[in-house]
UniProtKB/Swiss-Prot annotation:
Similarity annotation: Belongs to the UPF0284 family.
A GO molecular function held by the record: nicotinate-nucleotide-dimethylbenzimidazole phosphoribosyltransferase activity
Organism name: Pyrococcus abyssi (strain GE5 / Orsay)
Domain of life: Archaea
Protein name stated in the entry: UPF0284 protein PYRAB00380
High-level lineage: Archaea, Methanobacteriati, Methanobacteriota, Thermococci, Thermococcales
InterPro entries: Nict_dMeBzImd_PRibTrfase, Nict_dMeBzImd_PRibTrfase_arc, Nict_dMeBzImd_PRibTrfase_sf
């Protein structure tokens, strides 16, 4: 076994701000999205809720990509509860049940130290396994806003992506500036204090992935889009050698003109991989709309595709498997 895939689940109160996150049919349902994503990877459908996580317009969770890659390449997945409202109904490693607070009103993550410590300990244990690398994905609704807040606090002029083609950048920036006013800081003021940026504005997923990365000393693929840029920026500020890290994402994130993924990755100094998935010929509108800027990434979709490609499958194989899984979902839906 060369690679181990970890899926870190996180929640932040930021996802319940209307208009911030479409990683759930309603702002309230974003609280359930991480556990539903994890459950869907192992079952025909989630167990906590009798529905597949979708955007308000009905676009399926990117977990369908991760599940497709897993079914092809059969790599092992360990689910980690970084900090969520609910525990997933699948076997998982418990780091915390802390949910990130609304940073406009209070410090987002006072418990960051304990979360990092526990995740680091788990990373150190994984070091003892005969694996060469970790691939770490995430499911964290609202996480692109916390990530952008952390990046801004660290001094990066970053704009993060969104699961919507209409990136609510103005709303994000307004929310972030309210948080900065509450904390009494300006952009870039915490460039020398990465953990303070995490404490003030972060979420439990970021803290968990930072801890895992500090504990596991071999190669790490950060499987996510702009949220993993925040993780990378913190690790760099903590003095980590960025040569052992790579971000694996999808071409939909890389091509997102409303965000600065490529520029920010370059500024941090981390190499990136972009999964060349293509759903333009899908017979399902829910998948074709990925090509119109919906969803883009999540649940380690890019990293899972990368693992499938490493195992000898093509991005086309993954796309075909996604089609098959979506067809299965549609069939189940029509039977209910």
């Amino acid at each position: 076994m060369e690679s181990l895939f970890l899926l870190v689940l996180g929640n932040t109160e930021i996802s319940t701000i209307p208009g911030i996150s479409v990683a759930g049919a309603t702002p309230e349902l974003t609280k359930i999205t991480p556990v539903a994503d994890a459950e869907y990877l192992f079952h025909e459908k989630p167990l906590t809720i009798d529905a597949i996580p979708v955007t308000p317009e009905g676009h399926p969770t990117p977990a369908i990509i991760t599940k497709a890659a897993k079914e092809l390449a059969d790599f092992p997945i360990i689910v980690i509860r970084g900090g969520t409202y609910l525990a997933p109904l699948v076997p998982h490693v418990h780091i915390s049940d802390v949910v990130g607070r609304d940073f406009r009103k209070e410090i987002a993550l006072p418990e960051f130290g304990e979360i990092i410590k526990r995740a680091k300990l788990f990373g150190e244990e994984l070091n003892k396994l005969p694996i060469k690398e970790l691939v770490i994905g995430e499911s964290t609704p609202g996480g692109t806003t916390t990530a952008q807040a952390v990046l801004w606090a660290l001094g990066y002029e970053a704009r993060t992506s969104s699961a919507s083609p209409n990136n609510p950048q103005e709303l994000k920036e307004r929310v972030i500036m309210e948080g900065f006013n509450r904390a009494g800081i300006e952009k870039g003021q915490l460039s020398e204090k990465p953990l303070e940026a995490l404490r003030q504005f972060g979420d439990p997923m970021i803290a968990t992935v930072v801890g895992l990365s500090l504990g596991f000393r071999k190669d790490i693929v950060l499987a996510g889009g702009t949220q993993m840029l925040a993780v990378s920026a913190i690790l760099k500020a903590l003095g980590e050698d960025m040569k052992r890290f790579m971000i694996a994402t999808t071409r939909w994130v890389v091509n997102d003109r409303s965000a600065t993924f490529v520029e920010t990755a370059r500024e941090i100094g981390i190499i990136t991989y972009s999964a060349d998935l293509d759903f333009s010929n899908s017979k399902f509108k829910g998948l074709r709309d990925y090509e119109r800027g919906y969803v883009k990434e999540g649940v380690g979709a890019g990293g899972a595709t990368w693992l499938a490609v490493k195992s000898g499958f093509s991005p086309e194989d993954v796309s075909e498997k996604v089609e098959e899984l979506y067809e299965r979902l549609m069939r189940m839906k029509s039977l209910t």
